[in-house]
Design a protein with these regions (language model features):
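Non-catalytic, conserved peripheral segments adjacent to functional cores
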Residues: 1-103, 122-124, 131-135
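Short beta-strand His + acidic residue motifs that chelate non-heme Fe in jelly-roll/DSBH
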Residues: 81, 108, 116-121
Length: 135
């Protein structure tokens, strides 16, 4: 992870499974506040990337529109990247790359001041984005 106390955090969701299939929490304000979630949810988006190898990003908003986001993989897998773009950061342009997958139940918290993007690993990768600021 980048050399910042307030950097990206890999989140491992804990699904509950039984004979009916599975249930997993996507967002919990109390749990995410512990890792820096700044406040209310302003927008939730869904993306589907049809072809393996497709790159999407790098996206970020500068103040006063800076946003935090929780990126959750709900189908397939992606190589997800967050880049520190804070003007005053000694770690500026450092990055973290992690694999997010629906099977592993992984997500990433991307705080304000980080650009975000990903590359789809298999065909038909799907992500849910939870944003702190509306786009």
């Amino acid at each position: 992870m980048p050399d910042r106390e307030d950097g990206p955090v890999l989140v491992r969701r804990k699904p509950f499974a039984d004979e009916r299939r599975a249930f997993a929490r996507i967002f919990c304000a109390e749990a995410l506040a512990e890792i820096g979630w700044p406040g209310p949810v302003a927008q939730i988006n869904h993306s589907r990337t049809e072809r393996a190898g497709t790159l999407r990003g790098m996206h970020y908003q500068r103040p006063p529109y800076a946003e935090a986001k929780l990126v959750v993989c709900i189908r397939g897998a992606v190589h997800d990247v967050a880049v520190d773009v804070h003007d005053d950061s000694p770690a500026r342009y450092s990055h973290v790359g992690v694999e997010l997958s629906a099977e592993a139940g992984t997500a990433i918290y991307v705080p304000e001041g980080f650009a975000h993007g990903f590359q789809a690993l298999p065909d038909d990768a799907e992500l849910i984005y939870i944003h702190s600021v509306a786009y």
